[in-house]
């Protein structure tokens, strides 16, 4: 029997404002509501989900460094376009990850089109709202289970 799958969900700056910040781009649910639903979905699949949200880059880096997760789902938010340090943290721990964005970053301002993460991510999901997190969770669990069966 395969071991339980551990997922780390990392959310970057300003995502604590979900539900009130630009709901046209980011939706009406709070981050707490989204995370609660993801934890339930993970549990239904025999997986666990830990979560961190921070507006401080070093806190996200520390959480990644300390993680024993099998897979990371990350919405780096504004750090997408600026953080070599967060990229290096992900590469340093060598935990596979999926990059998620609630809005379609390619349909927004030009500065949002560049990501320091996309070229190293297993996959990138953007523009699908909170459903993107669910797709990432399903994919992460499936990928870990497939690797465990090898």
Curated annotation (Swiss-Prot):
Pfam families: DHquinase_II. Its EC number is 4.2.1.10. It comes from the Bacteria. Keywords: Amino-acid biosynthesis, Aromatic amino acid biosynthesis, Lyase. GO terms for molecular function: 3-dehydroquinate dehydratase activity. InterPro entries: DHquinase_II (IPR001874), DHquinase_II_CS (IPR018509), DHquinase_II_sf (IPR036441). The active site is at 26 (proton acceptor), 101 (proton donor). It catalyses: 3-dehydroquinate = 3-dehydroshikimate + H2O. The record marks 21 as: Transition state stabilizer. Substrate binds at residues 75, 81, 88, 102-103, 112. The keyword Cytoplasm does not apply. One of its GO terms (biological process) is quinate catabolic process. Pathway: Metabolic intermediate biosynthesis; chorismate biosynthesis; chorismate from D-erythrose 4-phosphate and phosphoenolpyruvate: step 3/7. The keyword Cytoplasm does not apply. Catalyzes a trans-dehydration via an enolate intermediate. Homododecamer. NCBIfam families: aroQ, PRK05395.1-1, PRK05395.1-2, PRK05395.1-3, PRK05395.1-4. Belongs to the type-II 3-dehydroquinase family. This is 3-dehydroquinate dehydratase.
């Amino acid at each position: 029997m395969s071991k339980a799958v551990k997922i780390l969900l990392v959310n970057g700056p300003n995502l604590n404002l979900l539900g009130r910040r630009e709901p046209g781009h980011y939706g009406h649910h709070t981050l707490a509501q989204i995370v609660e639903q993801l934890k339930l979905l993970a549990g239904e699949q025999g997986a666990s989900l830990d979560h961190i949200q921070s507006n401080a880059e070093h806190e996200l880096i520390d959480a990644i460094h300390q993680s024993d997760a099998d897979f990371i789902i990350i919405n780096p938010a504004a750090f997408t376009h600026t953080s070599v340090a967060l990229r290096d943290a992900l590469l340093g721990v060598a935990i596979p990850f999926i990059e998620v964005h609630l809005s379609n970053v390619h349909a927004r301002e030009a500065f949002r089109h560049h990501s320091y993460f996309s070229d190293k991510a297993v996959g990138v999901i953007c523009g699908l709202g909170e459903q993107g997190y669910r797709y990432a969770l399903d994919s992460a669990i499936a990928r870990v289970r497939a690797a465990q069966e090898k």
